[in-house]
Amino acid sequence: MGTEKYISEVKVIASPQEAVYQRLSNFKNMEQLFNPDKLTELKKQHPEMPDLQLENFQATEDECSFSVSMVGTVGVQIIERTPSKTIKLAGSKSVPFQFSCWIQLAPVDEENCKLRITLHAELSPMIKMMVNKHLKNGIDQIAEALTKIPYV
């Protein structure tokens, strides 16, 4: 097993840093966004938004789980918060491999902020061959999708 590191592109979000942090640091705030009707509405408003193919999203304040095509059920928990700056996540209960993830926020100005996602995944060589490209693309798609959701 080896630890692989995946870093998203830096994305700019057209919302204040604190508003973005408040939305992302509580999984219950994300729950409404992942119902099929809301995803369809967001996709119509932002046709360039990537199709994340998440299903069965369930959440508490600190944990969530969802199904991802070609991966299966993924459980995620928030393990650390640094107000307005960082949200650290880790795999919980049901994950196909162990991982940790950081969502980093930085101000651009009072009305905009930057976001970057870093993923560390424990992958066997065989699993890495199968999912390496999907993880890199997926982390960029998630970062891009996070620029499209409403924060204020």
Language model segments and positions:
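Solvent-exposed residues in well-ordered beta-strands and their adjoining turns
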Residues: V12-P16, S69-V71, R81, A106-V108, ...
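Beta-strand/loop substructures that line and gate deep hydrophobic ligand-binding cavities in soluble
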Residues: A90-Q141
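Short amphipathic alpha-helical signal-transduction/dimerization elements
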Residues: K28, L135, I139-Y151
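Glycine-rich portal/gate segments that line the openings of hydrophobic small-molecule binding cavities
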Residues: L42-A90
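Hydrophobic pocket/interface hotspot
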Residues: V20-L24, M30, I78, L89, ...
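Short, surface-exposed coil-to-beta transition loops
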Residues: Y6-S8, V71-V76, F97-W102
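Hydrophobic ligand-binding cavity/cleft-lining segments
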Residues: M1-N56
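Short Gly/Pro-enriched turn/cap motifs at secondary-structure boundaries
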Residues: M1, F66, K93-S94
